């Protein structure tokens, strides 16, 4: 198996690139670090974040599995997505807030789930703008504050 690169804790916080079907490791790693049974969504990401803090994580670019979502999959439940992101933030808050790129990536992901619950991601856009005050992020925050962001998001999802 060719290993392409090492993945750091901060890289994994910024981009969730793991699924349970693709994690390979020694049994002792998984006996030491367990799934958080209370995590309603992103259990693979939560587990990987815990593992990467203690063990070296590498990835291989080659596609090794096909993944299919079933109709009743938890990935189709946006409320669980919002709660899962909240729990990840509570656990990794300091690391997330230490890097504006991680803040933006993390809260954009959370905002997408908020929009799917038919709410505006005002708080998420506010945090993004606070940590990365660009004109674009101000406009996104303003759109969310005015209640328009979710409509634009949902229109974009249809195309």
Language-model region placement:
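Conserved nucleotide-sugar donor-binding catalytic segment
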Residues: 1-84
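C-terminal subregions of glycosyltransferases and related glycan-biosynthesis enzymes
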Residues: 63-159
């Amino acid at each position: 198996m060719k290993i392409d690169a090492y993945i750091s804790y901060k890289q994994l916080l910024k981009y969730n690139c793991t699924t349970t079907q693709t994690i390979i490791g020694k049994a002792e790693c998984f006996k030491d670090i367990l799934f958080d049974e209370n995590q309603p969504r992103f259990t693979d990401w939560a587990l990987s974040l815990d593992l990467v803090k203690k063990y070296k994580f590498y990835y291989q670019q080659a596609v090794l599995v096909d993944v299919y979502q079933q109709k009743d999959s938890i990935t189709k439940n946006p409320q669980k997505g919002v709660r899962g992101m909240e729990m990840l933030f509570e656990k990794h808050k300091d690391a997330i807030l230490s890097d504006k790129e991680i803040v933006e990536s993390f809260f954009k992901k959370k905002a997408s789930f908020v929009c799917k619950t038919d709410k505006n991601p005002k708080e998420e856009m506010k945090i993004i703008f606070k940590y990365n005050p660009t004109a674009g992020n101000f406009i996104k925050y303003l759109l969310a504050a005015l209640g328009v962001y979710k409509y634009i998001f949902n229109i974009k999802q249809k195309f």
